[in-house]
């Protein structure tokens, strides 16, 4: 199979790591007179549709969110990845607590897999570079990953971090060697990467997008006394301790990642502009 014009003047690969590629639309050319102005200024602000393109072969299969596939070329087949009723129940529980789909299909074979377009920014992360413990991500960020990447639900070690930290009681952790495609509400170059070496990071608010799974996460007062916290006006802060990495978003709370530009909203926007609408 050969695709002649996957890239052209209006569609270009913005980023590629391994067999994962991000196809970005420079502008939305299929517009009506009613929304042409909005689409024009959206393109100028780089609010663009993006699609993940994954090369599938005997050495590379992919796991994606259910319903994220748009089209596939070649001898590519989808499998459920469910090994039994117990495995299905476990996946259902995992999906319920992390806001992810319960069953994520795995695509195998030889060919090309293209995912649904989204207005979110796509982060391609090399999970192996996050160490043996892997990385923990915000709810709703997972889009796809290499089949060699294992996912599991991690719970907070203490109640304070879950109740007061704003990050939830459970999160999805990715481990292994391979690439993962994550959906972000902000561009990757707006994220700040903090490298910790037996150190600590204190953040006022739930601004962490993803972090090394081996880091200890707690919620503490910004000062040693209640009076000091009251005077400083800072109150409680999220504290990450240990050795690892943290990606934080200083311009928008991460709680908006899933809520403001979720998949349904992206599809609704796509439908209104007559391009890839469903």
Q: Each PLM stretch: what is its role?
A:
Residues 1-278:
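Composition-driven recognition of glycine/serine/threonine/acidic- and proline-rich low-complexity segments
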């Amino acid at each position: 199979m050969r695709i002649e014009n996957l890239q052209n003047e209006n569609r270009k690969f913005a980023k590629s790591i391994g067999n994962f590629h991000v196809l970005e639309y420079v502008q939305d050319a299929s517009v009506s007179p009613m929304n042409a102005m909005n689409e024009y200024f959206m393109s100028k602000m780089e609010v663009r549709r993006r699609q993940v393109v994954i090369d599938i072969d005997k050495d590379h299969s992919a796991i994606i969110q259910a319903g994220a596939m748009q089209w596939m070329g070649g001898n590519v087949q989808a499998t459920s990845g469910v090994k039994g009723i117990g495995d299905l129940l476990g996946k259902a529980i995992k999906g319920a607590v992390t806001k992810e789909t319960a069953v994520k299909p795995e695509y195998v074979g030889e060919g090309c897999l293209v995912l649904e377009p989204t207005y979110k920014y796509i982060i391609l992360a090399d999970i192996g570079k996050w160490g043996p413990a892997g990385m923990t991500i915000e709810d709703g960020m997972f889009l796809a990953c290499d089949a060699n990447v294992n996912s599991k639900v991690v719970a907070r070690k203490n109640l304070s971090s879950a109740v007061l930290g704003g990050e939830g009681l459970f999160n999805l952790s990715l481990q292994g060697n391979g690439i993962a495609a994550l959906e972000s509400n902000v561009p990757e170059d707006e994220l700040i990467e903090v490298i910790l070496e037996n150190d600590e990071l204190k953040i006022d608010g739930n601004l962490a997008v993803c972090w090394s799974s081996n880091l200890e996460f707690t919620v503490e007062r910004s000062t040693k006394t209640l009076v000091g916290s009251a005077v400083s006006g800072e109150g409680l802060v999220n504290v990450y301790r240990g050795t690892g990495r943290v990606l934080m978003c200083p311009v928008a709370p991460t709680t908006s990642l899933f809520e403001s530009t979720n998949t349904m909203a992206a599809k609704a926007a796509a439908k209104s502009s007559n391009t890839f609408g469903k």
